[in-house]
C-alpha cells in the first residue's frame, strides 16, 4: 500500500467488506514515489507507531502521520514488492505468487478468487 494512492485509500476504507467476504489483506509498504521520498518517511513512521493499525487508519483518513522511529527498513518492503512483480499500487499478491494489479472491489475480488480457486484446484 501507499498512503498517497487514492485507490489504496478506497481499498482500505472497504477493508471490513473484504473481511466480511472472508478475504484477508496484509499490507506491505510500497512508496510509489520511491525510497527517500516523503511517502517512504511517513510510511516508516506508520510502521514504527505504537499502534500501527490506528496510525495507518489515521493516515488513510487524512489525519496526518505522527513522527515515530524504529529500525524497520521500508526498503525491504519495497524490494520484496518489486521481486514479487509489484510495480504500482494497489496490488495484491496471492498465496501462489500471482499479482493482481490495480483496485478490485470486494465483490469483484471475491468472484475472481472463487474462480481462481476452482481453476487451480481442478474442480
Which ranges hold each PLM region?
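A short linear-motif detector with a strong N-terminal bias
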Residues: 3-5, 25-26, 71-72, 78-79
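Conserved helix-turn-beta segment immediately C-terminal to the redox Cys motif
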Residues: 12-32
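Conserved redox-active cysteine motifs that mediate thiol-disulfide chemistry
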Residues: 1-13
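Short, solvent-exposed mixed-charge patches
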Residues: 118-123
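Short, catalytically relevant binding-site loops at active-site mouths
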Residues: 6, 31-35
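Thiol/selenol-based redox catalytic cores and closely related redox-interacting motifs
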Residues: 34-110
Amino acid at each position: 500500500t501507499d498512503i498517497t494512492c487514492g485507490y489504496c485509500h478506497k481499498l482500505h476504507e472497504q477493508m471490513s467488506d473484504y473481511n466480511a467476504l472472508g478475504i484477508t489483506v496484509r499490507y506491505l509498504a510500497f512508496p510509489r514515489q520511491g525510497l527517500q521520498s516523503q511517502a517512504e518517511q511517513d510510511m516508516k513512521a506508520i510502521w514504527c507507531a505504537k499502534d500501527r493499525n490506528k496510525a495507518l487508519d489515521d493516515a488513510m483518513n487524512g489525519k496526518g502521520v505522527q513522527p515515530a522511529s524504529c529500525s524497520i527498513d521500508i526498503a525491504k518492503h519495497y524490494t520484496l514488492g518489486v521481486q514479487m512483480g509489484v510495480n504500482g499500487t494497489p496490488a495484491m499478491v496471492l498465496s501462489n505468487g500471482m499479482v493482481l494489479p490495480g483496485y478490485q472491489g470486494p465483490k469483484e475480488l471475491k468472484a475472481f478468487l472463487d474462480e481462481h480457486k476452482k481453476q487451480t484446484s481442478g474442480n
